[in-house]
A protein has these predicted regions:
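Internal, well-ordered alpha-helical segments in soluble enzyme and binding-protein domains
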Residues: 8, 18-22, 77-80
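Conserved small/polar residues in nucleotide/adenosyl-binding loops
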Residues: 1-2
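Short, conserved secondary-structure transition motifs
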Residues: 12-24, 46-47
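Long, compositionally biased charged/polar accessory segments in the mid-to-C-terminal portions
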Residues: 30, 34-182
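Short, acidic/small-residue loops that bind anionic groups at enzyme active sites
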Residues: 5-13
Length: 182
């Protein structure tokens, strides 16, 4: 059956921001500055500890810190993110993947400033899949204490400013909320 051919993998997730907000943000930049060549989010050129978004307009590149701040202050996430049924220790998948936060504290000799991935194996099928790919990876064995992070057991907490943010957005628009909250 299909279960023999498909692996079920879930992702450790902080949350997903509103696609409408991202689209309007890009449209606002383009309207004010000109055609966007590219717009990136969580760019790692300065390492994963200081992710920045960049926009390139008319050949000039610049960081965009306001949107990043809005993302990390948890105002712009989708409502379902705050009640995510998958952010739990009871995973029903073969494997969980995500960023290995705080690895520099728990396995310092393995820390990579561009990021380390975390694989949590839940089933024999997940273990079999990992055995197939681990030869292509540089791996270290860890334990749940070393790799624990908040979104492994609970959804992201809703910002106390979320309702105010969305009310401001609906009344005053994207530029206003980016200036006020970003």
């Amino acid at each position: 059956g299909i279960r023999d051919r498909v692996y079920i993998v879930d992702i450790i997730c902080h949350g997903s921001p509103s696609p409408k907000l991202w689209r309007e943000y890009a449209e606002s930049i383009q309207k004010k500055e000109g055609k966007i060549t590219y717009l990136t989010f969580k760019d790692k050129r300065n390492g994963w500890k200081s992710p920045t978004a960049y926009v390139k307009v008319n050949g000039a590149e610049r960081p965009i810190k306001d949107y990043v701040k809005v993302f990390y202050n948890r105002c712009a996430l989708r409502p379902s993110c705050y009640e995510c049924p998958y952010a739990t220790t009871e995973r029903k998948t073969d494997m969980t993947i995500g960023d290995f936060w705080h690895i520099e504290e728990t396995i310092p000799d393995f820390y990579d400033p561009n990021g380390n991935s975390l694989f949590l194996i839940h089933t024999n099928r997940g273990e079999g899949l990992f055995e197939k790919i681990q030869g292509d990876l540089d791996c270290r064995l860890s334990n749940t204490t070393q790799c624990w992070q908040a979104n492994l057991e609970a959804p992201t907490k809703k910002s106390e400013q979320r309702e105010e943010f969305w009310n401001d957005y609906q009344r005053k628009g994207i530029d206003f909320v980016m200036k006020k909250y970003g």
